[in-house]
Amino acid sequence: GTPCKCHGYIGVYWFMLAGCPNGYGYNLSCPYFLGICCVDR
């Protein structure tokens, strides 16, 4: 996916998702335009 910033961390932008997908170890997320930014810090 596309890199994105969330709370000072670099995360992955997921298009058209309301929540982070399971199985990736994400524990931080930020709402983005038409999607969500997920970080596994």
Swiss-Prot record:
Keyword Disulfide bond: yes
Subcellular location, principal: secreted
Compartment(s): Secreted; Nematocyst
Superkingdom as given in the UniProt entry: Eukaryota
Organism this protein belongs to: Radianthus crispa (Leathery sea anemone)
Task of the protein: Weakly inhibits human homomeric ASIC3 (IC(50)=5.5 uM).
Protein name listed in UniProt: Pi-stichotoxin-Hcr5a
Similarity comment: Belongs to the sea anemone type 3 (BDS) potassium channel toxin family.
A Pfam family this chain is assigned to: Defensin_4
Keywords for the protein's UniProt record, in alphabetical order: Disulfide bond, Ion channel impairing toxin, Nematocyst, Proton-gated sodium channel impairing toxin, Secreted, Toxin
Other comment: A synonymy between H.magnifica and R.crispa is controversial.
